[in-house]
Amino acid sequence: MKIEASALRQLGIKQIEERAAEIKAELAALRQKKNSGDVGANDIKTAKKNLARALTVRREKILEELVEAYRGTPVSKLPKELRPKLNRSKRRALTKTQLRRKTRRQRARMSKFPRVIFAYNE
């Protein structure tokens, strides 16, 4: 019988883990029965999907708790699984502060030779 994810979301993490253990035991029993031929066509398939659903909901709940625990911390201090997903080049790119920094020589040149804006009038 199919277990709904919404029903699992109402349970706690411990209860979901117990439920997953029950489903694993049921799946093992179904695999043993498979050899004798007493198992329906979709029984093993539904048991595997139920187990996947239970483990998915458990992971969601754990991540929700982690997000609450790390709320307000800077991105650099977050665990990698909670950081925003970026592609490789964006992960390696300089930050905005690093881009804005100038060397002493650059700052001196900028102050000595400011940008000249020419006005054009007819």
UniProtKB/Swiss-Prot annotation:
<keyword id="KW-0963">Cytoplasm</keyword>
<dbReference type="GO" id="GO:0003735">
    <property type="term" value="F:structural constituent of ribosome"/>
</dbReference>
<feature type="coiled-coil region">
    <location>
        <begin position="10"/>
        <end position="69"/>
    </location>
</feature>
<dbReference type="InterPro" id="IPR036049">
    <property type="entry name" value="Ribosomal_uL29_sf"/>
</dbReference>
<dbReference type="GO" id="GO:0006412">
    <property type="term" value="P:translation"/>
</dbReference>
<keyword id="KW-0687">Ribonucleoprotein</keyword>
<keyword id="KW-0175">Coiled coil</keyword>
<dbReference type="GO" id="GO:0003729">
    <property type="term" value="F:mRNA binding"/>
</dbReference>
<dbReference type="Pfam" id="PF00831">
    <property type="entry name" value="Ribosomal_L29"/>
</dbReference>
<protein>
    <recommendedName>
        <fullName>Large ribosomal subunit protein uL29B</fullName>
    </recommendedName>
</protein>
<dbReference type="GO" id="GO:0022625">
    <property type="term" value="C:cytosolic large ribosomal subunit"/>
</dbReference>
<comment type="subunit">
    <text>Component of the large ribosomal subunit.</text>
</comment>
<dbReference type="InterPro" id="IPR045059">
    <property type="entry name" value="Ribosomal_uL29_euk"/>
</dbReference>
<dbReference type="InterPro" id="IPR001854">
    <property type="entry name" value="Ribosomal_uL29"/>
</dbReference>
<comment type="similarity">
    <text>Belongs to the universal ribosomal protein uL29 family.</text>
</comment>
<dbReference type="GO" id="GO:0000463">
    <property type="term" value="P:maturation of LSU-rRNA from tricistronic rRNA transcript (SSU-rRNA, 5.8S rRNA, LSU-rRNA)"/>
</dbReference>
<keyword id="KW-0689">Ribosomal protein</keyword>
